[in-house]
């Protein structure tokens, strides 16, 4: 993780290799992956999930996060992905009206994937969700810039709505509502090098304004 950041990788998505970097087994995990590709690699990554979670070291993670913050790399945790894995699948489909609003071809693809998953969240999925919250909190405390992202339309990650959920999950992980909003506005503008023309509301800048009937700075779900 740190080698990539020091080499110039400006962003990291889905917390890829962040959890691994917070363990003393990062090197052996990565070396094993380098020998594979395609489906065998994906199978290995799944098999490594539990050992990586069990080897998590908070003190090490704090040091890694502080070091990562000095590189300027931005992390896009896409918390909605891990959150989707801990939702009861039948209930998520039957009671969420958004599922019926998804285009038929996307819905068919989702159904094919969801049919292979257990009806209730696994213990491993619950552990991964708790780890996601801990990792995002650690990165935030260390000053690593965070951007809001969703990876929609992954299964049960609804385009549009997922961004609002991501903001709420960032707040759950410890960001203030204002910090979560900046993760979807100012931080991306800085990352793209266009903060002088967008990302904040100011004279001479471009912006799309949304008028709300409640203050998201008090409650992020007011977005």
Model-derived regions: residue spans:
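Functional cores that coordinate and move charged inorganic groups
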Residues: 1-9, 20
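Divalent metal-coordination and catalytic microenvironments
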Residues: 12, 75, 151, 170, ...
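Glycine-enriched alpha-helix->loop->beta-strand junction motifs that scaffold or abut catalytic
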Residues: 7-12, 71-72
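Solvent-exposed coil/turn segments that connect beta secondary-structure elements
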Residues: 10, 17, 80, 214-216
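Histidine-centered active-site/metal-ligand motif
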Residues: 1, 11-14, 140
